[in-house]
C-alpha cells in the first residue's frame, strides 16, 4: 500500500503538507496570479499532481471561469480533491494516472506544484516534456519543485 492509498495518510495529507511547506497557500496564490497574467479568463488548465485538491481549490476561487484537468495517479487523493472542491469539482475533469495517459489538450496553461520529487529523476524530464506537448504555443506553465539533499 502506497502512502497515497493509505486512508490515514490521505485524510491527513493537507495538514501534513501545510506543516512541511511553510507558505503553501501563498505558493498556490502566487502560481494562480502568474498563470492569470497570460491565460484567458475562460482558460482550460492542466493541473499535474491534483490529488488533494489544494491548488485546484485556490485556482477555482481565483478564476471562476477556468476549467481544469486534474491528473494524479492516486484514486484516493482524487477523491479527496473532489470532496475539498465541493461544487467547484464540476469544473474539473479528474484523470487517474500519469501525464502520459492524460488527454492531449491543448491546454491554455499548466501547473505542477511540489509533484516532481515523487518521480525518479529520469522521469522528471519526460513528464515536463509531456506537459509542454499538451500546451498551446506560448501558454504559461508554473512549476515548483521540492528538493531534498542527496548524499554524495
Locate predicted features.
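Class I SAM-dependent methyltransferase SAM/SAH-binding core
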Residues: 44-46, 52-101
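A short acidic, Gly/Pro-enriched loop at the edge of an enzyme's catalytic core
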Residues: 102-110
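Conserved alpha-helix/loop element of class I SAM-dependent methyltransferases that forms part
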Residues: 23-41
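Residues lining the SAM
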Residues: 112-116, 144
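Short "lid" loop at the C-terminus of a central beta-strand within the Rossmann-like core
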Residues: 146-150
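Conserved beta-strand signature within the Rossmann-like core of class I S-adenosyl-L-methionine
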Residues: 138-145
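N-terminal, positively charged/glycine-rich alpha-helical extensions of SAM-dependent methyltransferases
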Residues: 1-12
